[in-house]
């Protein structure tokens, strides 16, 4: 008699999950996908990557024993299934919210989360270091890395060292043919052609059944298997990873749960003998038709119910991209480089319209900056579009290859200030501090459409030294009253005749301050140029006011406020300068209102400080 198919209506705890039969697991996969889609209906969440990795995440937790075996996701945002199965399903609706679950793996949240990550390409190095020096030899550490992230320079360095040291670790390559948007690079093209001989898999299966029972016979198994594998490679040829020295298995269908579980069970026994790679193919966005068909990255991270999903809402990024389109029409000598953030930086249309003027170099921030240096030396007018949090990865390249050579490259620094729901790994609050430590840097910040376009023109006209234009991901104000400014200028956002108190600030927070100040006798000065400001004009401002508050949505160290205090002291000015900024670098994640209040940079806290 045929049994009725068991329907799963609740995500089990991890202990019960390990006891489930295959047909139950398949039902659970359907429920997990529904949960992920439900989350994305109500908030901005990482949709496509989590839908694509459902079966792989389930298989890893089913075959291995977390937390004794550690499963670590590169970048970390593909962790929704991992969290739900490891006893956090009841809280999954709170993901990326204040006091809720993190959108990334987070050790402070659960023993099942090995490491906190957020940037791509670092997981192999972390896992190798842990495996080689961890005293508990019984633990397996399984890093999962995408086909885009593995092309990152740091990941390549790790692969080289892992192979050289013969580190016994299993690396899962989750190959979905996508980064956030379409993949680029030669390695992606090579990997798309990888295929493992079926005879190797069949031989391994037979050998394991016969010999993998006792410790002494395991050595015989391994010796025979290696010989057969070498013979197969002699006729078939080695792929890239095998040439480095990895035991390579794949390509398998990572969305086939039964096959993925079976292959992991077999490979699990081989890992102690040396570095091993399992290459799985998955479909990004599987289970949500629009996400499956999305080759642009529109469904990477979004709120499905957002009425602005398909709108042309004007952000700072879209203003910059649209203005550069006009500039390229005027001067075809312009070149734009972006490291893997074409869509989210709003450059997709420009990249299609001017393919010869635009290049996405993949997840390669260091390479992007140094390649820009080469283009500048070739007399191209270069713009680099890059997130603030990723710019910090290229510090040496900025110092050695750009600033030292005084090259006039423009950096459009996106996602500045706080990232809120993404958390600590994505806050753009450190760029001013580290950029100011590099000689010859021009640092600016825009607070509206007019300022951003004006700064792009000034950067385009700049003949020497790197020019940084900071902006947030927020909606870009298109102000009616446009105040012209020249290189190094500061402008009054609000001015009274009798006030002896002023706020100096810059960036998008200027707009919030302006609304709050209108009924108060306080002047508001927009420090468009954070460095290279007109010193005499700034000294005049410092001499005019008794109380000056420097409000910055950046980390306290080496900020504009520090410069102004030094400048006032050097010139023996009597003004009182107070810094209002971010003092805590353990910010976490959450809603804008909650995070601003926690850091005392919400409007109520700022004006309470001024009033006191």
UniProtKB/Swiss-Prot annotation:
Name-wise, this protein is: 1-deoxy-D-xylulose-5-phosphate synthase
- Record GO terms (molecular function): 1-deoxy-D-xylulose-5-phosphate synthase activity; magnesium ion binding; thiamine pyrophosphate binding
Keywords of the record? Isoprene biosynthesis, Magnesium, Metal-binding, Thiamine biosynthesis, Thiamine pyrophosphate, Transferase
Under which pathway is this protein filed?
Metabolic intermediate biosynthesis; 1-deoxy-D-xylulose 5-phosphate biosynthesis; 1-deoxy-D-xylulose 5-phosphate from D-glyceraldehyde 3-phosphate and pyruvate: step 1/1
**Is Cell membrane one of the keywords UniProt gives this record?**
no
Q: What family does the entry list?
A: Belongs to the transketolase family. DXPS subfamily.
**Tell me, what does this protein do in biology?**
Catalyzes the acyloin condensation reaction between C atoms 2 and 3 of pyruvate and glyceraldehyde 3-phosphate to yield 1-deoxy-D-xylulose-5-phosphate (DXP).
Q: Which SUPFAM superfamilies match?
A: Thiamin diphosphate-binding fold (THDP-binding)
EC primary class: transferase
Q: What is its EC number?
A: 2.2.1.7
Q: Name one Pfam family in it.
A: Transket_pyr
User: What reaction(s) does this enzyme catalyze?
Assistant: D-glyceraldehyde 3-phosphate + pyruvate + H(+) = 1-deoxy-D-xylulose 5-phosphate + CO2
Name of encoding gene: dxs
Q: Which residues bind thiamine diphosphate?
A: 77, 118-120, 148-149, 176, 288, 365
**Residues annotated for Mg(2+) binding in this entry:** 147, 176
Q: Which cofactor does it need?
A: Mg(2+); thiamine diphosphate
